[in-house]
Amino acid sequence: MRGCLQTVRWLTSAWQRPPSYPPLSRAAPCRFFNVSIPRNEQSRKPVSDLERRIAAIPIDRFRNFCIVAHVDHGKSTLSDRLLELTGTIQPGGNKQVLDKLDVERERGITVKAQTCTMLYNYRGEDYLLHLVDTPGHVDFRAEVSRSYASCGGALLLVDASQGVQAQTVANFYLAFAEGLKLVPVINKVDLPSADPVRALDQMANTFELDPKTAVLVSAKTGQNVEQLLPTVVEQIPAPVGVHTKPLRMLLVDSWYSTYKGVILLVRIFDGEVRAGDHVGSLATGLKYHVGEVGIMYPGQTAQSVLRAGQVGYIYFNPAMKRSQEAKVGDTYTKVGSEKLIEPLPGFEEPKSMVFVAAYPVDASDFPHLEDSINQLLLNDRSITLQKESSEALGAGFRLGFLGTLHCSVFEDRLRQEHGASIIITPPTVPFKVIWKDGKEEIITNPALFPEEDALRAKVVELQEPFVLATLTFPEEYLGRVIELCESNRGEQKSLEFFTATQVILKYELPLAQLVDDFFGKLKGSTKGYASLDYEESGWRRSSIAKLQLLVNKVPVDAVSRVVHSSQVQKLGRVWVSKFKEHVDRQMFEVVIQAAVGRNIVARETIKPFRKDVLQKLHAADVTRRRKLLEKQKEGRKKLKAVGNVVIEHKAFQAFLAK
């Protein structure tokens, strides 16, 4: 009993006694945590060998350059070889370090512009090289143009076996307009089909570049690639900037990190930026505290400072949470210096030109689809998003893209990275409606297209977008390509031979025809040897109409499209015959029609199930026979009048599949 009381007494006294920690001396440092980053004088000093080397390099030994080429001419592979030569990555293998997306590696294309910093010792002196790997496809031209603004020169890369292609020409003129110094490079000289002499002649005739300055390489094997770096140092000019001037920082790109918020890829034109600096946006007026600055080497490598002439990344603390605040082309400066600097020339906001509707296969997956789309939009602000609803397919989204490849890449990323099961409608383009009261309206959703009565009474004219397409292909396919363009309502603008066997053909085409698998048809007509590039050519007056699919005279809202009047009959017949294949028979007759307003352009009928009501009758009982048939007929009419056609969800999925 005494032992129990002693135990209780000890426990109660221990509960009242303060913990016996050793007392803190006055000299002991006390650590406090704070969300903001204090300005530390030690951060001004280089803390690593890499920073010491970079700090010792003056701006006249900086080189900012990119690689200009047609899609699939070897830009990313050449980037890997340059990173290996400078010791930025370990040699061996085709890593495609700058292609970070799964879809980029799978398709062999570059979608997002990436940058990497390299240190190169040339004749005993260190040089700081910033390489930007840009997309080659026309759909990602916004990525290309913003990359060029951060560079002083470019390697103009041409495949030795394919020669100059359409996007080589288009990207050359973009780089030329930015005033970049161009260095000709012939790639894939190791291929049996390589013809470097022909490629050099094409570059001389098309771009007026001196073939003697060209470097012949094989990015795959590394042959002759080591000659490129001295060429970059000698021919590409150093950036212009003064690190003692007020900060002028151009936003080139941005992406989203779960832990750091929006990360900005920036080019410093004047001044310098450090962790702890208070900076502001000239476009939005918002102000931020810099959390970290650094370079891509090849991953994010923190630095004490980014100086004039450098390309690097920054993020803020507290973080920038909304990617809409990061406006590409915006100028940032330190708070208090806004009136001391002029904003840098920005970029035009990209305009969506191809629209699709996306619906989940299972309606219960809508929240997951919405979350997946919003996550991808954090890294791609060129996509427009609007919620919409369909009676046939349920809740979904209308998405706007820069082009068909942009749309296809986004769809692949939804499926691969987020496991989304989705139904995508065929791509459509915007149309312009000019009303009699003078107002103009751009319509991106076929469901909002004016009805027939409104068209007659209130609309002055309808317009559709046109593009100027540049096609390059061998001369032997000229007849087929012209026939294809003419059948797609094209208007020829120019025809020239830039070599004895290669043709550059320019046509003005409706964008609606271009997104309707025009490139696939072009590849088929030229056995895969043609290339295509295009640019906007304005709006044209056009005879267009809204084609709808009706099931028992009820419009199917998920299947409607604005098309040219010349395509109405053909597309209507295709629709009704294809839809008939996927609709099950009912207890009553199902009529499938394609219509423009009240005008029916095509029709298919699905016969009902038929019960043999005459099975038990005697052959001679004509009156009873007629009576039963009439009763069955009346029953079908009544069922057709009040019954709803049951169309399975998978029928729409199969109908909308490519």
UniProtKB/Swiss-Prot annotation:
GO CC terms, sorted: mitochondrial inner membrane; mitochondrial matrix
Catalyzed reaction equations: GTP + H2O = GDP + phosphate + H(+)
Source species, domain of life: Eukaryota
Membrane topology category: Peripheral membrane protein
Compartment(s) of residence: Mitochondrion inner membrane
EC number: 3.6.5.-
Transit peptide endpoints, chain numbering: 1-40
GO terms (BP aspect): positive regulation of translation; translation
Binding site for GTP: 69-76, 133-137, 187-190
MF GO annotations: GTP binding; GTPase activity; mitochondrial ribosome binding
InterPro entries, per the entry: EF-4, EFG_III/V, EFG_V-like, G_TR_CS, LepA_C_sf, LepA_CTD, LepA_IV, P-loop_NTPase
Keywords: GTP-binding, Hydrolase, Membrane, Mitochondrion, Mitochondrion inner membrane, Nucleotide-binding, Protein biosynthesis, Transit peptide
Domain (tr-type G): residue spans on this chain: 60-240
Enzyme class: hydrolase
NCBIfam families, sorted: lepA, small_GTP
Family, per entry: Belongs to the TRAFAC class translation factor GTPase superfamily. Classic translation factor GTPase family. LepA subfamily.
Described purpose of this protein according to its UniProt entry: Promotes mitochondrial protein synthesis. May act as a fidelity factor of the translation reaction, by catalyzing a one-codon backward translocation of tRNAs on improperly translocated ribosomes. Binds to mitochondrial ribosomes in a GTP-dependent manner.
Name this protein carries in UniProt: Translation factor GUF1, mitochondrial
Organism listed in the record: Paracoccidioides brasiliensis (strain Pb18)
Gene, per the UniProt record: GUF1
